[in-house]
């Protein structure tokens, strides 16, 4: 009788631990999905920096100052270059 009770309690404990671990893994996978756009944002930032720098260089060659309105979306024209604000 004691062995049966110990076996049942052990199985219940293992089941609870297994369910808890599964829930933690599911929560971690959801966090990872939310975190994915960070790498995409870095690529967008690099592209925007390149585009703004090129447009500022073109204006600079034409003996014009970099126009502040050229840089958009959190970028600002500074020292004839567009920089992230």
UniProtKB/Swiss-Prot annotation:
Residues 23-48 form a propeptide. Pfam families: Toxin_20 (PF08089). Disulfide bonds join 52-66, 56-77, 71-82. Expressed by the venom gland. Keywords: Disulfide bond, Neurotoxin, Postsynaptic neurotoxin, Secreted, Signal, Toxin. It comes from the Eukaryota. PROSITE patterns: HWTX_2. It is found in: Secreted. GO terms for molecular function: toxin activity. One of its GO terms (cellular component) is extracellular region. Residues 1-22 form the signal peptide. Belongs to the neurotoxin 12 (Hwtx-2) family. 02 (Hwtx-2) subfamily. Neurotoxin active on both insects and mammals. Monomer. This is U4-theraphotoxin-Hhn1a. It comes from Cyriopagopus hainanus (Chinese bird spider).
